[in-house]
Amino acid sequence: MTEPTQTQPAVTADENQIIAERREKLRALREQGVAYPNDFRPEHHAADLQAKFADSDKAALEANPVEVSVAGRMMLKRVMGKASFATVQDGSGQIQFFVTPNDVGAETYDAFKKWDLGDIVAARGVLFRTNKGELSVQCKELRLLSKALRPLPDKFHGLSDQEMRYRQRYVDLIVTPETRDTFRARTKTIASIRKFMDNADFMEVETPMLHPIPGGAAAKPFVTHHNALDMQMFLRIAPELYLKRLIVGGFERVFEINRNFRNEGVSPRHNPEFTMMEFYAAYTDYRWLMDFTEQLIRQAAIDALGTATIQYQGRELDLAKPFHRLTITQAIQKYAPDYTDGQLSDDAFLRTELKRFGVDVSQPAFLNAGIGALQLALFEETAEAQLWEPTFIIDYPVEVSPLARASDTVPGITERFELFMTGREIANGFSELNDPEDQAARFKKQVEQKDAGDEEAMFFDADYIRALEYGMPPTGGCGIGIDRLVMLLTDSPTIRDVLLFPHLRRED
């Protein structure tokens, strides 16, 4: 038995012509009976067979025949007269089919020769190893289960148009193994997080997606209307206030992995619809949260990749080492050491510096900004992008942390952190504000900012205040951006690479 060199059939007609030819083949199939049968149940997967019989040589397989049934998409076909090969890809991997008229019958063999790449096919047969050593299925029964009308991208060029990969993710998944690996890693990451939370006695919950009042984050919401109730509603920007209501209700450890929606810009790090994991634990604070978050992320990397040392965009990131901790001003002075303590406490100086970096300090968010908010803005310009190694930035100002507990020792500061790595925020957490009067006052301040033109300022949530008035235990809470975490673990440069169906402009 001989095998030809693997080659891709040349495309001699444009795509429309190919589709027309395939539709004609489909018409013929319909005339023969059921064009899309659904009575074949594969009992084996390609990757499992490849792994199980990796050490079985040709003689061993001949001495102990193994019957298998496999189904998948035909990715390559080589017709050689009285013997042909096909590479078939299922959800686990690929395996080769060997087809002859003696084994499957002349009629089936003639039909097989007309099948196209992309068709879903199925076979029952016996495993053997070719002269070149490739594990293959010697087909005894061969069937066409689903006719593909559109041709797959060229094997050697693949789906080179990046936007087309996002827009037609189904094609990208067919032809790009790396894409399939990315989303398998995403699933492993989320499974790891769920297991970690379960082992720490957290209860997974689901809270509303439609909110009468948007809250839990500084963001612009999507607005909709509930017809039956005749009321304006908002797609949630965060689940925080509902999860903390559950803490009030007596569930002392809760978490939720779900979608948030923010009506804001699209960038390599931002998608209007994204996945967050938020968790809350009674009788903890932000220092406990930092330790817990560090352990969780480290374990997620190990479970998804088998190691805590990862490569991201050509640079190493070691999650096994203890994460750094810096205040906002410490981070600024680490990466911009010329700034003095006095300058970083000078309102006029900070505003001048921000203007130098191109920040519009006349916008509503800056009109009444205090020193803390200005320092945070300068941090974003000077230090944030430099935080490659995992670093907790701690002690955020009260004015930009309306839901966080104030420090008992440092006026104007909250017990809050944000976790950065590779120059981007991954998590945000804090000791929760459980003083209802303080929370009401901060909500009022947010409303004033909204009235002044800050679209991302929060609304006043009277029901949440009422919940706090029943008493919420001391609590710590944290949100982790699942998409950004998966970006790091899969070496993906943009958030679109880790979303199965990212938002794009309409094709027209």
Swiss-Prot record:
Predominant localisation class: cytoplasm
Enzyme Commission number(s) from the entry: 6.1.1.6
Keywords: Aminoacyl-tRNA synthetase, ATP-binding, Cytoplasm, Ligase, Magnesium, Metal-binding, Nucleotide-binding, Protein biosynthesis
One Gene Ontology term, aspect cellular component: cytosol
Full protein name: Lysine--tRNA ligase
Entry keyword Cell division: no
Alphabetical list of InterPro entries matching this protein: Aa-tRNA-synt_II, aa-tRNA-synth_II, aa-tRNA-synth_II/BPL/LPL, Lys-tRNA-ligase_II, Lys-tRNA-ligase_II_N, Lys-tRNA-synth_II_C, NA-bd_OB-fold, NA-bd_OB_tRNA
GO biological process, one term: lysyl-tRNA aminoacylation
Cofactor, how bound (note): Binds 3 Mg(2+) ions per subunit.
Locations listed in the record: Cytoplasm
Chain sites annotated for binding Mg(2+) 2: 425
Highest taxon of the lineage: Bacteria
The keyword Metal-binding belongs to this UniProt entry's keyword annotation: yes
Subunit structure: Homodimer.
Reported cofactor(s): Mg(2+)
Pfam family, one: tRNA-synt_2
EC top class named in words: ligase
Family under the similarity heading: Belongs to the class-II aminoacyl-tRNA synthetase family.
Binding-site list for Mg(2+) 1: 418, 425
UniProt GO MF annotations: ATP binding; lysine-tRNA ligase activity; magnesium ion binding; tRNA binding
